[in-house]
Amino acid sequence: MEPRPTAPSSGAPGLAGVGETPSAAALAAARVELPGTAVPSVPEDAAPASRDGGGVRDEGPAAAGDGLGRPLGPTPSQSRFQVDLVSENAGRAAAAAAAAAAAAAAAGAGAGAKQTPADGEASGESEPAKGSEEAKGRFRVNFVDPAASSSAEDSLSDAAGVGVDGPNVSFQNGGDTVLSEGSSLHSGGGGGSGHHQHYYYDTHTNTYYLRTFGHNTMDAVPRIDHYRHTAAQLGEKLLRPSLAELHDELEKEPFEDGFANGEESTPTRDAVVTYTAESKGVVKFGWIKGVLVRCMLNIWGVMLFIRLSWIVGQAGIGLSVLVIMMATVVTTITGLSTSAIATNGFVRGGGAYYLISRSLGPEFGGAIGLIFAFANAVAVAMYVVGFAETVVELLKEHSILMIDEINDIRIIGAITVVILLGISVAGMEWEAKAQIVLLVILLLAIGDFVIGTFIPLESKKPKGFFGYKSEIFNENFGPDFREEETFFSVFAIFFPAATGILAGANISGDLADPQSAIPKGTLLAILITTLVYVGIAVSVGSCVVRDATGNVNDTIVTELTNCTSAACKLNFDFSSCESSPCSYGLMNNFQVMSMVSGFTPLISAGIFSATLSSALASLVSAPKIFQALCKDNIYPAFQMFAKGYGKNNEPLRGYILTFLIALGFILIAELNVIAPIISNFFLASYALINFSVFHASLAKSPGWRPAFKYYNMWISLLGAILCCIVMFVINWWAALLTYVIVLGLYIYVTYKKPDVNWGSSTQALTYLNALQHSIRLSGVEDHVKNFRPQCLVMTGAPNSRPALLHLVHDFTKNVGLMICGHVHMGPRRQAMKEMSIDQAKYQRWLIKNKMKAFYAPVHADDLREGAQYLMQAAGLGRMKPNTLVLGFKKDWLQADMRDVDMYINLFHDAFDIQYGVVVIRLKEGLDISHLQGQEELLSSQEKSPGTKDVVVSVEYSKKSDLDTSKPLSEKPITHKVEEEDGKTATQPLLKKESKGPIVPLNVADQKLLEASTQFQKKQGKNTIDVWWLFDDGGLTLLIPYLLTTKKKWKDCKIRVFIGGKINRIDHDRRAMATLLSKFRIDFSDIMVLGDINTKPKKENIIAFEEIIEPYRLHEDDKEQDIADKMKEDEPWRITDNELELYKTKTYRQIRLNELLKEHSSTANIIVMSLPVARKGAVSSALYMAWLEALSKDLPPILLVRGNHQSVLTFYS
């Protein structure tokens, strides 16, 4: 049966389209192995598998597929997996197969056509291309049907037929062949046994033939592409099926996106990986050319040729070797740490900056990255000036100076740095070739010196060179410090010669395999250069004496009896050097290596090579590091330098900047001051690399798993300490300056808070500390002195009730816990998706607005159930809420009384589990969620720039201040506008943007917006009135005290109001003053209210009765059965008996409101004891009416009731 025709695919070259159906000739002509998934061809009468691969749906003709057994309308999640990775070889093989198929079809070849010559090329039997994923060990799976081994004719005829167990087809996925029982892995060289048909396989729509683990399901097998970053260098990230795709219920109708019908492809299909390199021709270096050569050239600097002999003269052979080994210890430890970080995941460009920033975070990385890039830029000038000085010395010897010494250094240095810039800009390949040439010259110079030590000439003996002599070795083994030099000063001079170990790591982005190259190249370079330094130190110390005159007449003719020096024993008298300075010898001549060498010009070439190679390495490193720093946008002002050019993404702008910096310091030509600072910059980088390894190991993050195992966290810490010590040894003031610069940059980056998340060890250690302290805290018993208000605040979306949020934050900030509870109601599936999104969104909103709080969403059928979940489960260990904070239900008179009953039951639930309760009421209300979408309304009002301001009448159904389930806009409302003089003023306006029309709000919403921000500003000199009527353990008093400790509230005075009797007012005042003094709480006044129990005014009683009238049961006016039925159905109703029983308490609430208006109407805020209603005795309507009567028409009021356990104590 012929498959149905389908629309051609627009896939990438070399990748067969999803909708294409290969012909029989094409299938017979080639065995194309693609390292990805394949879709088997399915006859049209075979039913397609269900989306989850768990069965087969019989959908009849309507479910006919595209000829490949797939439904015509794949869902976006299906199309995501329809194309897999294709190597470059496979692409060429597919093209060859297609050409062969076309030729066979033109010749009239049938299904049994023989293999074409292209078959071998397309079979994938040739060796994979170097660097391809297949060559790197990418897994490949062949699915072979047993029938395929019989003959080509059987194979091809069965491909179109249906057997008992499905079509007998051969299909493959490359590489590891999966065989059915009785099949053979190896096919014969001829006939049909060598033919394997290639098909495309979609795990989402056809899993009938894939009876092997990992392929008979939508689940994806583990593969490297699922773990790539979206900006991966080797290919794009391939998405695995989401948990929702595997777990959610199937849709009744598949989503039709038109892709299978030849329409525009879906975005998910466009994002499928093509797994090619970034672009053709990208230059990548191995460990020798990329790391070893660079590190050796950078470590072997001018110091090797012109200072090492002087160091041996000063410190002697023994201490010189010790100096070298001390420097090697520091660099080796740093090399081990670098290797550990470099093998803990894929390393990109950026060198030391990348390693430190991804380990310690952007703060340290940003600081080090900037100074390290600058240090490399200035190092270019240092090395070029060293080269120029050597050239000027040669010119001076031959008396051919151009102007004078200083200007000649500038001219030669400028010309040199221009040439080096040209080599660098030409590309990394040219730069690498130049480094190889310079390394060869350097090695020849070292060899020239070694050969020269074995062929001493008579003419060189007066200059102190006698060849290898035990007398010279013994004399030079000990130190002879002169001119106030010490061991540490000599060490400070030598140590810069040991730096340069990061030369390879600095171009990590240009390495083929940084994880392997950096450890091998860096550590081997340290070993080789150390051996060379030690060898040359011992050689020169064994061949050359410390002092020599250079005078051939200083030979000794007769043997002296008092001869002690090595020169004297070798028949030379250089004793005159003790009284007058000499020009030769280790102590006096910096050109000892040139003198000793067999061919002096080669040493000069070695000096040129050492300086130019180091300059070239630094000229390449600085822009690469700076580009990586700019790409991360740590310093937004430098963003322009992130741009790369060409196939290698070369930082041309960075090259120009580095060139200008280097040229500036070359023209100064005085680097004696800046040199120690640069050395300290390098050492600071080394110290932080070592500290990064220690810190990452200390944090015990599961993500810290370096492939390089030869490191130790304590040795890394020792290395960091040694680096800091060496910084002070080299130059103490430069070390201090380095610390100041690093600290300043660290503070800047910390303040700016760059929007990056690299999973640093700082984050890991933060978690570990929090975990350890939480566990430790769980073993601490509660004590009254350590009580802290830990509030569960039913905010809903945090930005919907800013006044509630800020007020609670004012007394919990840096003192107690604050959790913003949000109850999601509605269909569970939708609510779960919203919660997943809201969790991250609102936590970010809290952090952005500097709210020290946690966001806790929960799904429930209703508000009460959600609050119960939160009260029982929110928090961790001892960090659990102990106080429930609610907004007052302002709309209770218009709301469904079942919602009111649910609201009141939150109080009872909180008291049941020993929570305190705080109710916050603002007369304007708390909920501004209905205003947060108003910006969208403005777009419809904008007609032209000349449109007049439009008054918006905001119509909405008033929602409860407690409704915690409404979806909200993330953007907060702003009503600040700029006046003509540029000052910012608060206006009752809502703006969309600066250029749009200004839309006034109505009066009610204007007041609501003003009230919502009242706790965000300084409260001024006013009072906090505390009505501590009932002893709840002290929470009613503790909250206002905590408010006064905050900056915004510090000018407010606490006034305390208590109930009492008229004949005991003075006594009660003194008793309360004594108690407050013992609690050490400052207060401005204490007022004793002796008339609390006075009957309230009649009009207020009438107003209260009008409020409760709709909610009364009036059982005396109804038959008993009807009344009982109503009470059962509507338990919130107020009975006559209940109203009479609690008349006194009702009057008290009304009376207290009158007293509050009398005494506290001007207070900033009122904190008052919350009346408690006995559960089962007081109806919800009556209790709600009490709260309404008590708190209406007042300044902001907090109704507080602790759990009646002491939270204050006067004991020490």
From Swiss-Prot:
Glycans are attached at N553, N562. One of its GO terms (cellular component) is extracellular vesicle. It is a multi-pass membrane protein. Phosphorylated at Thr-203, Thr-207 and Thr-212 by OXSR1/OSR1 and STK39/SPAK downstream of WNK kinases (WNK1, WNK2, WNK3 or WNK4), promoting its activity. K(+) binds at N298, I299, Y383, P496, A497, T499. Changing S489C: Slighly reduced cation-chloride cotransporter activity. Expressed in many tissues. Changing R307E: Abolished cation-chloride cotransporter activity. Changing F487C: Does not affect cation-chloride cotransporter activity. Changing R294A: Severely impairs transporter activity. The keyword Glycoprotein applies. Changing G301C: Impairs transporter activity. Chloride 1 binds at G301, V302, M303, P496, A497. Changing Y533 to F/E: Impairs transporter activity. Changing S242 to A/E: Impairs transporter activity. Changing E431 to A/Q: Impairs transporter activity. Homodimer; adopts a domain-swap conformation at the scissor helices connecting the transmembrane domain and C-terminal domain. The RFXV motifs mediate binding with OXSR1/OSR1 and STK39/SPAK. NCBIfam families: 2a30. Belongs to the SLC12A transporter family. This is Solute carrier family 12 member 2. It comes from Homo sapiens (Human).
